[in-house]
Amino acid sequence: LDPAVPGAISPVHLGQIRLDTPVVLAPMAGVTDWPFRSLCLGWGAALYVNQMITARALVEEHSLTWKLAEFGHGEPIRSIQLYGTDPKYVALAVRMLKDRLDIDHVDMNFGCPAPKVTRNGGGAAIPVKHRLLGSIVESAVKAAGEVPVTIKFRKGIDDDHLTFLHSGRIAQEAGCAAVTLHARTAKDLYSGHADWDAITQLVEHIDIPVFGNGDIWEPWDALRMIRHTGAAGVEIGRGCLGRPWFFSDLVSVLSGKEPNLTRPSLGLVADVMLDHVRRLLEFYDQCEGDVVRRFRKHAGWYVAGWPVGKELRRRLHAVGSLDELTAVTADFDRDIVLPPEGVRVKRSHTGGPRKVALPEGWLSDPHEEIVLAASAEVNVSGG
């Protein structure tokens, strides 16, 4: 793959926000909290979006939700993903985020394929209903004022019920600053290959910037996607789990430089793991054991693709304190580098395809006026 010519990848503007390197950290519930975002921020400039929170929980003053919505001291761009199914709650939540947290950007999630969300008409099921999607997005944009709003969605329910072109048009007409397409259907979940040709279609269909999401496992994939699709930028989800340094290589590749951390040393991984836990302990007002147990899923991602052996993996998944993690990482062979076959190892969600659970008759009339029950607003990561 020919390197990018310096300056060939144009900056992207979202309102007053200028992204010189058009890379976005995908918001992931339970993952992209401030400790993880701050780690990523130390490796490269990008738009680091806070984890998904629900509008209803904010409006109803759920203390944990407000804790998860917090930003770090000096965080350069206060960006957050909001999920809501009721336009009134969405508008109230956006105003509260502006007033209390002085947010700079709101992203909205319409891509979650989890059955307990879609069977109630939420998540990836919402774009089927054009009026519902439009009313939710319009309420967010109106409440946000000068704060840019973006939305993320999938191709559709399945290959027979594609909604992404309509969703892009609705977002543009509502005043969104950009959209992100996860180039899979809800039925696909996270299986198979992302359909980058769908991103191309969306780019050609609307005038606002399109970010592509799906199958960026190494930095060169980002350049391939942009060249293949004409997308304005890329959004990174599973590809950065367990490797926050991924953003350093993305910035390098998109600015015409060679990446140097595609195959890091296990010593670097150990150091970053310990740094990550220290940041978690500083951020969360919980006992050390609870915080370290929260980290265990990250630990599995950090060593994905590494030949560390079953015993070290077992010990990692049982750690209950920073001292225990320090002892386990002390047994790492710090000098080995990630094997070539480990670069593209998939992390987190890998399931699918699976029939999408939907309310009865949901696909019959895309223009139907509909109001969703509160049960459609469940805080489940996905997009």
Task: Please state what every model-predicted region is.
Residues 12-24, 56-77, 112-122, 142-151, ...:
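N-terminal small/glycine-rich loop or linker at the start of catalytic domains
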